[in-house]
């Protein structure tokens, strides 16, 4: 299988989901999935279940959100404010974001390691404005991390585009699902139609 084959399959799948299924499917330029989820959670004001193992979403738990991890098969717990504080200070290696004591390239330069941050410092800095404990370089790195990690820091133009697309997206009719499942010989799904 080639990358072109993969992208063609994904495009076909997205088109079919948008046309046949009773769900809104959003793809917004310059927005990642977590940006879209964050904007919708905050603007719709409804109870939400986020189905993801990504701990970045813990920062949204303050917005009437619960999160379930399908990998761990359990609900994700965590304090929204502490989780955001911890990621802003310690970075997120999985997303390529270094801690505030390390420069931008530390995670990509082979053989280099981040400068460690003691748990005691992390606790001491909680709830304090970064300007009060950061050097100039640390503050620059803190602001870098805030821009990359904080789901409250999504650029306004992206937020507007997400909200606009959500309002304008038309969903497929639920009654068309049976036709889709039959045409694609999806017998198991046909038997569980009510779950859609």
What are these regions (language model features)?
Residues 1-180, 184-187, 191:
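Extended two-metal-dependent nuclease catalytic cores across DNA- and RNA-processing enzymes
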Residues 194-196:
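Short, amphipathic C-terminal "tail helix"
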């Amino acid at each position: 299988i080639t990358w072109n084959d993969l992208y063609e399959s994904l495009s076909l799948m997205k088109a079919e989901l948008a046309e046949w299924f009773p769900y809104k499917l959003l793809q917004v330029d310059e927005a990642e999935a977590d940006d879209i989820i964050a904007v919708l959670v905050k603007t719709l004001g409804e109870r939400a279940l986020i189905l993801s193992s990504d701990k970045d979403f813990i920062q949204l738990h303050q917005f009437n959100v619960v999160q379930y991890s399908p990998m761990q098969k359990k609900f994700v717990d965590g304090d929204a404010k502490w989780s955001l504080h911890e990621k802003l200070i310690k970075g997120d290696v999985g997303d390529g974001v270094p801690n505030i004591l390390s420069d931008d390239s530390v995670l990509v330069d082979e053989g280099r390691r981040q400068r460690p941050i003691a748990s005691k410092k992390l606790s001491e800095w909680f709830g304090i404005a970064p300007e009060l404990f950061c050097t100039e370089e640390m503050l620059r790195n803190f602001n870098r991390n805030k821009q990359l990690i904080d789901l409250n820091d999504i650029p306004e133009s992206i937020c507007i585009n997400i909200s606009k697309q959500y309002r304008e997206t038309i969903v497929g009719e639920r009654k068309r699902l049976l036709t889709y499942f039959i045409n694609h010989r999806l017998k198991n799904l046909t038997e569980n139609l009510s779950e859609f």
